[in-house]
């Protein structure tokens, strides 16, 4: 069974969409299920009337990238590069709301956004 607790959430309010990483206890590290969920969220945002997509983390970290332990456990390839490309190609303007530390692949994800801004934690 797939653990859906802590999957990234999507909220669309008016013309602003927000994807929020929900794993502050592990520095918002992303696993394969998270990547799939974010891809679905990006498809939803691209099909919506949103003009802005904000990506943010919860807690004191923005994102620490992909959970490489999932690769060691025999899981399929991460797909992280495809996620970064999807963010770069996203129709709305993308903003990384950096609420704290950005590590590993989280740096690539932030750089894939059109803008990066520091926000209070």
Task: Specify the residue positions occupied by each region the protein language model found.
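Phosphate-coordinating loops and pocket residues in cytosolic domains that bind phosphorylated ligands
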Residues: 29-32, 73, 112
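Conserved CoA-thioester-binding segment of acyl-CoA-metabolizing enzymes
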Residues: 1-58
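Histidine-centered beta-alpha loop that forms part of the nucleotide-sugar donor binding/catalytic region
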Residues: 22, 66, 99
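Glycine- (often His-adjacent) and acidic-residue-rich active-site loop
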Residues: 36, 57-89, 102
């Amino acid at each position: 069974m797939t653990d859906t607790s802590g999957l990234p959430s999507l909220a669309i309010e008016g013309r602003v969409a927000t994807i929020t990483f929900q794993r502050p206890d592990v520095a918002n590290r992303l696993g394969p299920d998270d990547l799939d969920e974010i891809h679905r969220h990006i498809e939803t945002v691209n099909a919506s009337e949103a003009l802005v997509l904000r990506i943010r983390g919860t807690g004191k970290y923005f994102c620490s990238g992909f959970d490489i332990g999932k690769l060691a456990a025999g899981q399929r390839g991460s797909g992280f590069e495809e996620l970064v490309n999807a963010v770069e190609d996203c129709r709305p303007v993308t903003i990384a709301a950096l609420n704290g530390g950005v590590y590993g692949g989280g740096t690539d994800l932030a750089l894939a956004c059109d803008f990066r801004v520091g926000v209070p934690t």
